[in-house]
Amino acid sequence: MADKIRPVWVVGGNRIPFQRSDGKYAHASNQDMLTAAVDGLADRFGLEGERIGDFAAGAVLKHSRELNLSREVVLGSKLAAETPAFDVGQACGTGLEAAIVMAGKIAVGQIDSAVAGGSDTTSDAPIAINESLRRILMDANRQKTVQGRLRQLLRVRPGMIAPEIPVNREARTGLSMGEHTAITAVEWEITREAQDELAYNSHVNLAAAYAAGWQDDLISPYLGAETDGNLRADTTIEKLAKLKPVFGDRDTGTMTAANSTPLSDGASAVLLSTEDWARERGLAPRARFVDAEAAAVDYIVKKEGLLMAPAYAVPRLLARNGLTLQDFDFYEIHEAFAAQVLATLKAWEDEAFCKRRLGLDEPLGSIDRAKLNVRGGSLAAAHPFAATGGRIIANLAKLLDEKGSGRGLISICAAGGQGVAAILER
């Protein structure tokens, strides 16, 4: 272990273009996509054959065959097979949490370099069998004779044969993230117009980033895809206003397919290291990984908003680092739903919430919206759950590197009432 905490740097990142579910990546697995993202990272930073200190990644939707996903990715990638690896899981915060864990190991001197990432596919989601059928099959497998197995299998009924397709619902409530957010939108009085404006800006900013070539050193093509499949460069506020609600009340709902992220597929990876490790290899670190915080809310008994945990994580992070909400040059807030972003921002402006829930004397205040997701967000790029963290880290590190100085805030909401936040500096 190091005698003192060492600075940790984001050297850079790579991802494959995110695609809508059942699109170009319909037959690609988590392992396929994450390996492609890691190989792109290896090509960009000359890591082929390099033994990295550690590798951590994860996926929200995993098959049983992917129990050792990260290690299998390493073994199939251009990294040295001697690179150790393990899986991380925190729903939509997985990619960022993987980076936090790796940054911690670098900071205390356990390793000098690491790769963190995430992958998710809703096109190749695991399909389960009926629970009763599963138990019968397990009972049959335990039998010592053919007759015993047949007796167990004769218990199977036609209704047990139908597969169980995974659904995007919280196990404790039976509601989807969208349905939970629709409740939050009503509670915080988030208007349809405000949500559509956020979605519009997300697409405009990402389209401009592609047009300027800004994404070129952050993305590697995969299976014929060179840009994010969800991006609508020609969208307008008028087009968005015509869409019907998909969550909440059919007549008064405000959440549409455009101001909510679609199911999607993709993968990302980021390279973290000490400054010396990077310089020795001729690499220029982009931003320092300063600190991070995770939080959770009780959305079951206390009925808090499912995706409102970042509203708690961020002020704790600010307090520990002696910062205010306004002390940032960039804000990278994950746009699972426009309503969730706007509700979080509104909570930080709300005196009652900040006093009663956060224990503050006054509101955190507002952010400069011109600094929010300036190169596009999840509403435009899409949100392959575990891959979002890597996209955001790489984006923010590049923004800070280009500016030459400054500070950026990351905020990601996650299923299960969780949230993760982090600070990067240059």
Each language-model region and where it sits:
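Condensing-enzyme catalytic core mediating Claisen C-C bond formation in acyl metabolism
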Residues: 1-28, 152-167, 241-312, 320-321, ...
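N-terminal extracellular/periplasmic Venus flytrap/periplasmic-binding protein-like
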Residues: 14-16, 26-36, 44, 157, ...
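Conserved beta-ketoacyl condensing-enzyme motif
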Residues: 26-114, 119-144, 213, 219-229, ...
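Short, well-ordered amphipathic alpha-helical segments that serve as non-catalytic structural scaffolds
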Residues: 30-45, 69-73, 98, 177-184, ...
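Conserved catalytic cysteine-centered active-site region
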Residues: 59-114, 157-160, 172-176, 234-262, ...
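Active-site-proximal alpha-helical scaffold in enzymes
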Residues: 89-120, 128, 185-214, 269-277, ...
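Flexible glycine-/small-residue-enriched beta->alpha junction loops
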Residues: 113-183
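Active-site pocket-lining segment
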Residues: 297-380
